[in-house]
Amino acid sequence: MRIGLFTDSYPPYINGVSTSVETLKYALEAEGHIVYVVTVGQDATTYSYDEEKHILKVPGLPLGIYDYRAASIYPLKVIKKIRSWNLDVIHSQTELCMGIFARLLAKQYHIPLVHTYHTMYKDYTYYVSRNHKYFDMGCKKAVEYLSKFYCDNTADTFIVPTIKTYHLFRDEYHYNKEIYIVPTGIDSSRFNRENVDMLKVGEMRKKLGYKKNDFVYLFVGRMAQEKNILFLLEAMEEIKRKKKSNIKLLLVGDGPDKDLYDKKMKEMELTDCVKFFGSAPWTDMPLYYHLSQAFLTASVTETQGLTVIEALAAEKPVLCIEDEAFHTMVVDKLNGMFFNDVSTCVKEMIELSTNKKEYNLLKKQTKSSIKSYSLSSFANSVLDVYKVAIDNFNNKKDFPNIVHNTVKKLFDKKEDEEWKLS
């Protein structure tokens, strides 16, 4: 197949969607398919196309939210290039700029469209509402309407990564069409101990000031309100109060609230047991998993939580807050533990760090618990959905054009012009 992935996030930008899209590209190519990526670049004026990697980047302007950039929803300069690919299917990975572009192209040039819903937008509305109760309620209703519109009216098939997102659409949004649950896979071999430079891991532990008997909990993610970082700091404050000085917490990642949490950590006098490392290259992530003993997260806004799968691939037991997003990955007392509040979290953190027998038992069962997240399984599950999308597209009757006819009239006259990438 010739497949087009449209996304607003792609490396070098680091987040869950970016990782998922890059992983999907790699997995599909490993199965013999040709995969193109259309994404937003880091420059405000430059178009670029990597002929070897099949990655097309359009200009983008900073939004002022993390490192996100906004692009034109119909960048004319790249239309001819994309048409030359003769795509069999378009797979949208976003509801925003490149997602709208994907929908317009799919409709205008009669290409089947698959959409994956990656982000629990209802958990992020406070960025707009600033936690104003009634405004936030309105924002959540708008998110519900737009989410249903994108997934119901504009896509031939619809993918979600977890049962949590499935229930959001079925139970809260009352979405009645077929939903395909396809968890993102990972290249677990990257995290195998034999493929990691353990000498470098030892050097990193030493540089961070960790002693041989220190039990290090690792969190990897964005330093922002939705990741519930304050919860982790409160847990560490209680652990310090209990004089468990060998328990440490390392937080890897950047974000809008990093300085706020760093200040809070100092106010709570946790500098001896908590470290904020900042962002780290994706290629170095296996090193961080292996310098820790276990993974810890209190985030309740995940659609899937790829970092949890990565931790399990590195044979690290996972302690996570009770949330449906983690239920398909973590089994209590098998490869990790669940907690509901700070006191339970503290209790389990201490238990795992002191009960060597239980720790080794959980560790032993980590890798076997993520076999279903292999790259091959991921690619073939998505390919099955593509086949359904193509069948649905070929069998359906014409449907309302919404804004597509208007766009077609505006831009069809430009098709024969030469648009060259700079």
PLM feature spans:
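A conserved mid-protein helix/loop that constitutes part of the nucleotide-sugar donor-binding site
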Residues: 19, 215-238, 249, 256-262
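Aromatic "clamp/platform" in nucleotide-sugar-dependent glycosyltransferases that forms part
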Residues: 300
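N-terminal subdomain of nucleotide-sugar transferases
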Residues: 1-45, 49-57, 403-422
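Short hydrophobic beta-strand element within catalytic cores of glycosyltransferases
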Residues: 317-320
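Short alpha-helical donor nucleotide-sugar binding micro-motif in glycosyltransferases
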Residues: 279-280, 287-292
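Conserved acidic donor-binding segment of nucleotide-sugar-dependent glycosyltransferases
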Residues: 332-343, 351-356
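Carbohydrate-associated surface elements
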Residues: 41, 164, 185
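Nucleotide-activated donor-binding/catalytic signature segment of Leloir-type glycosyltransferases, i.e.
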Residues: 260-280
